[in-house]
Amino acid sequence: MNTSTTTKSKNKPPKSTPSTFIKIIEFWFYLIQILTVLFSWRVYFLFIDSKKKIENNNNNDNDNNNTNKNDEKRYLTFKEKVQHNFFCLFTDTLYFMMLIITCTLFFWRLKDTLSLLKKSDSSKYKQIIWDQFSGGFVEFGSFTVLLLLKWPVIFKVFWNKGTEKEDKSTWSQIFMREFSQEVDKNKLGGPKPPTTNTTNFSGNGSSSSTTNATSSSSSQANNKRAMSDDEWRHAFRRDLQNIGFEFDSQTGDVSKFPPTEVMEQYQKSAEFRDLILASGSLKAGSEQQDKNKNNNNNNNNNGPKIEEYDNQKQEEEENEEKETNKQQTQKDDEKETSTTTTSSNKKSKKGKKNKRN
């Protein structure tokens, strides 16, 4: 019995214990952590009783017990507080650098940033700084790209400041508007050459060909002036997003409206006027295309009837000419008879006078 117990004890693996070297490293790292936190503004949080939720991974059948256990909170130990505040110092320094960059490089956002920081709670400081920093970075990048590639746009914006034509859009909105127009132009491409549609009709042994070059060229001219329905909607939605409208991704309805001043300014802008003119030309072009399509369909469906209609028209014209000729001859005959009667009456009167004399 004693031998079996001794063999079992020998076969058991020894417990893994950390080496002294690792313990020394952990001690010095903890010492650095506590010293940095003590000499930072985070020392205040070391003496606050902060709670932390306990993560419960046990699977119990009773749901009420699970919810109660998941909602339980415990106080952090002093060591956990030191570690938590030490790692929070890194994020604090990053956000502090973002704040300095926002206030110096993106100085036009300084007023909004400070006002938001004063009004908001301290728990929202990092989110506010990140939003202002990312927004300022986008604005600065858009301005730089426009300055390098499309400097006349920037000159126009500064030139119209303080006037009725002032563009109140942000630099990112102007950037999206300018470069999205170029993308749309590249997608549209150049105009297509006019095509001639010849249709042969076989009726009564004769054939006729009709060319639709003029109709196709006129419809292409209208298409060149106007944009398609989808392009017009895309341009209008893009302009609304640029001035501050927000749309729901699922339903497509408007979820946020801009201020009334911005909407009034947009209604007075040249872009809104161009869109309205484009919608008018779009309707005219679509109506012209529908008419041309209907004419082509009628010609294709009623080919043999065209010749019959032409023949009937010619017969009617010939009959009208015959009737007019008959009427003209009757009028001429009446004139001749009237002239002969008048001349005979004059002769009879002269004969009577001569007899009297």
From Swiss-Prot:
Region (Disordered): 184-229, 283-357
TM annotation in the entry: 21-41, 86-106, 135-155
Name of the protein: Putative uncharacterized transmembrane protein DDB_G0291600
Keywords: Coiled coil, Membrane, Transmembrane, Transmembrane helix
Main localization of the protein described in the UniProt heading: membrane
Highest classification ranks of the organism: Eukaryota, Amoebozoa, Evosea, Eumycetozoa, Dictyostelia
Biased composition (Low complexity): 195-223
Coiled-coil ranges from the UniProt annotation: 305-337
GO terms for cellular component: endoplasmic reticulum; lipid droplet; membrane
Topology in membrane: Multi-pass membrane protein
Compartments in which it is found: Membrane
Ranges of Basic residues composition bias in the record: 346-357
Biased composition (Basic and acidic residues): 305-314, 322-337
